[in-house]
Amino acid sequence: MSSLVERLRIRSDRKPVYNLDDSDDDDFVPKKDRTFEQVEAIVRTDAKENACQACGESTNLVSCNTCTYAFHAKCLVPPLKDASVENWRCPECVSPLNEIDKILDCEMRPTKSSEQGSSDAEPKPIFVKQYLVKWKGLSYLHCSWVPEKEFQKAYKSNHRLKTRVNNFHRQMESFNNSEDDFVAIRPEWTTVDRILACREEDGELEYLVKYKELSYDECYWESESDISTFQNEIQRFKDVNSRTRRSKDVDHKRNPRDFQQFDHTPEFLKGLLHPYQLEGLNFLRFSWSKQTHVILADEMGLGKTIQSIALLASLFEENLIPHLVIAPLSTLRNWEREFATWAPQMNVVMYFGTAQARAVIREHEFYLSKDQKKIKKKKSGQISSESKQKRIKFDVLLTSYEMINLDSAVLKPIKWECMIVDEGHRLKNKDSKLFSSLTQYSSNHRILLTGTPLQNNLDELFMLMHFLDAGKFGSLEEFQEEFKDINQEEQISRLHKMLAPHLLRRVKKDVMKDMPPKKELILRVDLSSLQKEYYKAIFTRNYQVLTKKGGAQISLNNIMMELRKVCCHPYMLEGVEPVIHDANEAFKQLLESCGKLQLLDKMMVKLKEQGHRVLIYTQFQHMLDLLEDYCTHKKWQYERIDGKVGGAERQIRIDRFNAKNSNKFCFLLSTRAGGLGINLATADTVIIYDSDWNPHADLQAMARAHRLGQTNKVMIYRLINRGTIEERMMQLTKKKMVLEHLVVGKLKTQNINQEELDDIIRYGSKELFASEDDEAGKSGKIHYDDAAIDKLLDRDLVEAEEVSVDDEEENGFLKAFKVANFEYIDENEAAALEAQRVAAESKSSAGNSDRASYWEELLKDKFELHQAEELNALGKRKRSRKQLVSIEEDDLAGLEDVSSDGDESYEAESTDGEAAGQGVQTGRRPYRRKGRDNLEPTPLMEGEGRSFRVLGFNQSQRAIFVQTLMRYGAGNFDWKEFVPRLKQKTFEEINEYGILFLKHIAEEIDENSPTFSDGVPKEGLRIEDVLVRIALLILVQEKVKFVEDHPGKPVFPSRILERFPGLRSGKIWKEEHDKIMIRAVLKHGYGRWQAIVDDKELGIQELICKELNFPHISLSAAEQAGLQGQNGSGGSNPGAQTNQNPGSVITGNNNASADGAQVNSMFYYRDMQRRLVEFVKKRVLLLEKAMNYEYAEEYYGLGGSSSIPTEEPEAEPKIADTVGVSFIEVDDEMLDGLPKTDPITSEEIMGAAVDNNQARVEIAQHYNQMCKLLDENARESVQAYVNNQPPSTKVNESFRALKSINGNINTILSITSDQSKSHEDDTKPDLNNVEMKDTAEETKPLRGGVVDLNVVEGEENIAEASGSVDVKMEEAKEEEKPKNMVVD
C-alpha cells in the first residue's frame, strides 16, 4: 500500500480535464529530468545523413538518443516544444501516441502515395483513415491528424490505446444518430480569452493563455508566434499588469462622495442607457454618496445588471476598486458578457470552477507581483513591500454563492469598495449560510438586486434591509411591534419614509411604453381516456388512505404527486409506458395518451409554420424527456436545460438558441433551472406545461421572453387539466398571491395544510367518476379544432394584459416605491378575511369526518370491486406486478421523478467537485429516500454538536421519537404513529432506530454513566419514566382490546370498583363513557387532554358539563377569534353570571350588543374548557391507577383475595363515591402551591421614595391590607371554589372590603396636580353602581376564578388616568391545583 501511495505522489498533475472517449488513461508525459539507460544506438539504413528524416533539410536538428534518426522539432507529430531536451527518442523508437490527451474526430483524408511513378508528375494522393488527436500539455491549436497505421503500430506497445479508439467509435455512433451538428474543435477553444502570465524561453516570449469556453485548469503556454493574431489580448495583458493603468486624471479637489448627477449616458459606457436606467444609475450614485445601502428591485427584464455595471464603471473612473459581484452560477457568464459590452476597460475576473482552476485564478489573476521599494525608515535599512490590498489586479470579481462559503478564507480579507448581490432575495433567511458569510465580508457599499423583493411577507423584506444596514434595521421583533397594524395610514406613511431611501422599484408597463405587450391565456384541457383511467385508479387504490380519519399528511402529499404526474402524462407513472418498436406507432400512442400533448401538438405545428419560437416549461425532468422524444420525432431543432446541466453548458445552449439565424425552434426548460436570470428574448411564445406551486417561479419563467430586447408580442399559454388538482392548485395559488399583496400586515409564510390538500385532491373527483347519464358528468367536453387554435395563436387580437398576476403584486406594498401612494385593504375587509380564516380553522376538527364520508361514498364500491379483482387474479396465478402502488403500501410513491432542481436555482450542480450541492430551499419539504438497499449501513454515530446523529437521526428527530413514544407507546411495534411525524425517515430507518432505542432502555440502569453500553449518549433521558409510560400504554391497549372482545363485560371487576369507588357510575357519567375515554387516550395520545376534549366524535363535552352541574357553552366564530386574541387576564366580573339550568347550553353573544357580554361569554367558555380538561385528566389518572392495580394483582397472583404487599392502602379522601358529588379537602400542601403575597415594608417604602407625596404611602398601605385579606381567607376561599360551593359569610365580607380598598386606590391614582375636580369625577369609576350578589353562581371566592374589581364600562377612563390597579386571578401552572388571586 505504501508503494502505491509513493507512486501516486510522484505523478504529474496534468490530468485530462475530460475525455471524449471516457477513458481512464493515466499515462503522463515523463519528467524532463528522467534518466534512461545508456544503450547502443540502433543503426537505421534509411537514415538521412545530417538531414531531417521528414523534410530532408539540415540545420537545427534534434537527434534521437537510441537510433540514427534526426528531425526538426517542427516536423515531429506532435511538434517538439523543447528542442534542447536530453535523452529524446524519435517516434520510431517510442510511439508519440502515448501522449494522446483526446481523440476528437475520424475521417478519410488524402495523403501522398508511397509509390512513385515513372513520370515526374505529382504523385496521386490516396485517402486513408486518420484520427484527429489532441496531445497532452498542448492546446487545441496543436491538434494533429494521425493515420490509422500509426495507431496500429502503437497497439503493440500500448494495449489500452485500442480500448480508447473503440470507445471513441462507439461515441461517434451516438453522435451520428443525433440531430445535433458534430463539431470536433469549437472555434472558441482556439480563441484567446485572457493571457495570464508571460515568460521567456530561448529568446522567445511565451504566454500562459486561457481560451474561451475553457476553464482555468485548461490553460497552456503558447509561443508569441502561435498567438500573433491576438495582439489586442496581448496588449490588454500588458495594460492590466502595468501599475500606471489606474493613474487617471482625477479631480482630487472634489470629494468623491459628492453626488454628481448624470444627465445623459456617460462616455465611459459603451452603450446607450434608457431614461429609466439613467435614473437608476443616478439613484445608485446618490445612495453611494450618502453611504445608504439599497435594493434595486426593478421588475425582471428591465436591466438591473446594466445599471449595476454603470455604477461600478463610474466608481472605476475615480479609481475606487475592487468590487465584488455575487450571482447565481448560471448567470455569471451573462454578467461577464455585459461587462465586456458596457465597460470593457474594467478587468473583470470570473472566480469559480474546480479547486485546480481556482488555484490558477488566485495565482495569476488576483495580485500583481510584489514591487519592493524603500520607505521612510523607522529602522535603518527597513524595506517593505506593497500591501496585498494595493496589489489587487482585478477591478471586479464575479463569483457564485457557493464560492462565498467555500473560499471565504481567500475572499473575506479583501476590503471591497462595493458588494452587489444578484437575486438578493436569497438573503431573506438570516439563518442561511450565505447570509452569515456575507455579513462577515468588509465592504463600503452594498446593493441587492432582485425582481421579487416581497415574495411572502414584510419580515423577509426586513431581513434584506437588516443585511444592508444592521444598525438602522436591527431587531425584527421591534420592527414587527412597530408595524403590527400596517393597515393604519400613519404606519404606512412611516414605513414608506423609512424604506424609501433604500428601495427603488419600477415595472415594465410604467417605464417601457414601447415594449410589445404580453398576454397570458389559460387553456383548459380534458384528460384523455387513459389519463382518466389512471386518475381513478390512484383514488381507488388509496381508498383506505383517503377515508382514514386523521390520515398522515405525507400520504396525501404523495397521492397529489401521483395525480400531478398523470395530469402531465400517464407515462410519468412507473411501468405505464409500453414497449413499442414501431416509431410511428409509439409516437401515436404518446400523443393519444395525453390531452395536453394533443393540444400542444396542434399548437406547435402552427407556431412552427408561422415562424414563432417557443419556450416550454415543466416541473418534471421525466416530462422533459417525453417532450424531447416528441420534438425528436418531429425532427425539430431544440435546446434543453434542466437541473443537471452545468453553468458553462447552459450559456452555450442559450447562445445557440439566441444566435442570429438560429434554427432552434423550441427550448425545453425546467421551471426552476430555466427561470432565473437568463435572457431568451428571441422567443415570443411561452408554454407553461404544468404550473409551479410558487407563482413567483412561473413569473420568473415568463420574464425570460418578455424583457428588454423583445421585439414581438409575447403569448403565454398555461395548460391546465379541467376538473383536476391542477385547476384547483391554480385557483389557490393565485388567490394566495392576491391576498399576500392585499393584506401586507397579515402576511405569514404558511405551508399547505391537510384540509387544503384534501380540497385539492377532491376537486373534480365526483365528476370524474360520474357516468355519462349523471348530472355531474354532463359537462361538455372541450374540443380545440383548427379554427379555435388559429384564434388562440392570432397575435393581432393581443392587447396588453389589464391585470396579470404580477401586476397584482404592484397593487400592493411595492407600488409605493415608484413614487406613488400606498394602496391597502381597509380594516373591515381585513377583519372579514381574518374571520373567514378562523371559521375555517373551527371546521377543521370536523373535516376528517367529512373527508372520510365523502371518499367512502364515492369509492367504497369501486375499492371492493378492485380488491375482488386482485384476489381473483391472485387465485388464477395471473397477478402481475402492480403498476400503481397504494400510498398506504408505499408512502414514498411517485417522489423519485420530481425535478431535482433546487428551490431557487440549479446551484446544486456546481462545477467544483468540492462544492457539494446545496440542500432543498426554503419553502419545500425534502424528498425521502426509499431505503438503503445496496448501500452501506448507516453509522451508529456521526458528526458533532448540532450535526451529531444516531443512526442518521439528528437531535430534533430523536426528540420527536421520544415524544411520540411517550404519547403513543410502542404499540405493536409497527411504528404507525411515528412515520407521519418523522417525514424525512423511511419505515425501515424508524424501525432500526426504534429497536436500538428499546435495547438502550432495556439495559441495566447506571445513573453514573452518561452513555449507554454502545457509547450512545443518554442526553438526559429519564429511562424509568419511559419504561413506566410504555407499560401503561400497553395496559391501555390491552384494556381496549378486552372491551372490544367482551362488549357485555364490565371494564373492571367489582373488587377494583371497591378499591376505587370513584370509578362507579355517576348521575350522568357511566361505564360506557370510561370505555370512550380509554379509546381516546390511544387515539390522541397520553397527556393530550385538550385534544380529547375537543374531539367532537367522542361527544363528551356536554356529558361532563352535566355531570359537573356546569352549563355547556358554545361560541360564535367571531368570539372564538376574540378568545384567541385575549391575553388571559380576564376582564369580566364573574358576579355578572346569570342563572342557568344545569346542563343547559349557552350560546355566546346571541342577543348581546355590549362588549361586556362578549367578554363574559369568553370568560365562561375558557372556564368551562379548564374544567373539562381537569375532569378528563383526573378521570384518566383514576383509570390508570385502577389498571395498574389490576395488573399488580395478576402479577402477584392474588386474584383479589388479599392486598398487594408493596401497595399502600388506597386513600381517596378527595373523591367521593360518584363522579359528580366528590368533595376535595384543602391541605397545606395545596396552599403552598399558590402564589405568595409579599407585603411592602416601611424600609422598602423609604428606600424607593422619590418625593414626599403621601399618596404613595397610602397606596402601599392599601396594598398591604389586600395581602392580609388574601392570606386570612385563602383556605376557605379555595375550599369553596374547588368544591363548587357558595363562599362563607366571612369570605363575602372580605370581598366587599377588597372592593372598597380597590376603589380607594383608583381614587388616589386618578388625581393629578393639573386636573380639575370635574375631570377627576369623569375619570374615576363609579363603584357605587356595582351590584355584588352573594349567590353561589354569581360570586367566586377570593382564591378561585378570576376577579376583576374594575367596572367594565370604566376601564377606558381609568386607563386614560395616571394608572390603574386591577385585581386579577392567575391560573396555577398545574391544572389539578386551585387558583389564586394575584394583585398587580
From Swiss-Prot:
What segment(s) does the record annotate as region Disordered?
893-941, 1122-1152, 1313-1344, 1365-1384
Sites where the protein binds ATP:
D298, E299, M300, G301, L302, G303, K304, T305
Q: What else is known?
A: 'Gymnos' means 'naked' in Greek.
Record EC number: 3.6.4.-
Task: List, for all copies, the residue spans of the domain called Chromo.
Answer: 98-180, 190-249
Composition-biased stretches, type Basic and acidic residues, lie in 1316-1341, 1367-1384
Q: Which UniProt keywords apply?
A: ATP-binding, Chromatin regulator, DNA-binding, Helicase, Hydrolase, Metal-binding, Nucleotide-binding, Nucleus, Phosphoprotein, Repeat, Zinc, Zinc-finger
Q: In which tissues is it expressed?
A: Mostly expressed in tissue undergoing significant differentiation (meristems and primordia) such as young seedlings, influorescent tissue and young siliques, but not in endosperm and seed coat (at protein level). Levels decrease as organs age. Also present in trichomes.
- Positions with biased composition (Polar residues): 1138-1152
Q: Which compartment or compartments is the protein found in? A: Nucleus
Which Pfam families does the UniProt record give? CHDII_SANT-like, Chromo, DUF1087, Helicase_C, PHD, SNF2-rel_dom
Ranges of residues in domain Helicase ATP-binding: 285-471
Motif placement: DEAH box: 422-425
Q: What is this protein called?
A: CHD3-type chromatin-remodeling factor PICKLE
- Which species? Arabidopsis thaliana (Mouse-ear cress)
Sequence ranges of Acidic residues compositional bias: 893-912
Family annotation (PROSITE patterns): CHROMO_2 (PS50013), HELICASE_ATP_BIND_1 (PS51192), HELICASE_CTER (PS51194), ZF_PHD_1 (PS01359), ZF_PHD_2 (PS50016)
Motif Nuclear localization signal: which ranges? 376-383
What GO cellular component term, any one, is given? nucleus
The disruption phenotype is:
Hypersensitivity to cytokinins.
Domain spans labelled Helicase C-terminal: 599-760
Sites bearing Phosphoserine, chain numbering: S23
Family per record = Belongs to the SNF2/RAD54 helicase family.
